[in-house]
Amino acid sequence: MIRFDNVSVTYRGGVKALRDIDLTIEDGEFVVVVGLSGAGKSTLLRALNGLVPATEGSIDFNGTEVVGASASELRKIRSDIGMIFQTFNLSLRTTVLNNVLMGRLSFVSAWRSTFGLWPAADREMAMQALERVGIVDKAYIRASDLSGGQQQRVGIARALAQEPKVMLADEPVAALDPITSRQVMGDLRRINQDLGITTLVNLHFLDLAREYGRRLIGLRDGALVYDGDIADVDDDTFTEIYGRAITEEDLMAGVELAGHGPDETSDG
């Protein structure tokens, strides 16, 4: 279980990124977080794994306090959290399999990973992760040869190889075309359903949030302004969260109608 208790984050210069967040996420939930740019979505995820320190309040991660945690405690917390990034964060010059094996770093000695002497069990786990996202046939090619959607699937497989209790996806489809975005969101939803991994996804496109989410969290100016079941969400809900009317730019359907997206190449 994850619990935020009166959590605030203030950056240098006095910018308050999170304001008095009270939030509980149960094991196995699939939660979508929405809000305008600067609303605090990324800060919420980064505060959970200790990348951004909370300046007030407490964060409980499966019984361990994140705020003020020691270096060893933070390493343990982060080993239980798989991160998926908007920019993929892959090593493009090496193979897809080697990228996924990076998710096993906390389980092997430094010399083994340095020389690529991964245990057979770790290699098998990495291949299973690639199988789960549908690109096991790409295991031995360079990551640079993949499309954007395929690279994001490698990122998901790498997080999955970590055997996480929680997966955090920060705008995972922001750089992808509409078809590929739905494929990636489908992968995340299926992993959550099949493996019961608690999943938090930051999204910009509100129709994707409605299509794939089960619970919706809305942030505005660092404050929690909505928390409820996705079945109860309508356009008025999003207007309330954003503090303005919804535009085509807020919808994946708007991108489709415009006839283009950030990543023109769909990878099937």
Regions found by a protein language model. Give the residues of each.
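Helix-to-loop junction immediately C-terminal to a conserved catalytic motif
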Residues: 49
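ABC ATPase NBD Q-loop/coupling interface
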Residues: 58-76, 117-119
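Conserved ABC ATPase "signature" region
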Residues: 65, 108, 112-137
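Conserved ABC ATPase signature
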Residues: 142-146, 150
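Conserved catalytic motifs of ABC-family nucleotide-binding domains
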Residues: 163
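Catalytic Walker B motif of ABC-type/P-loop ATPase nucleotide-binding domains
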Residues: 167-170
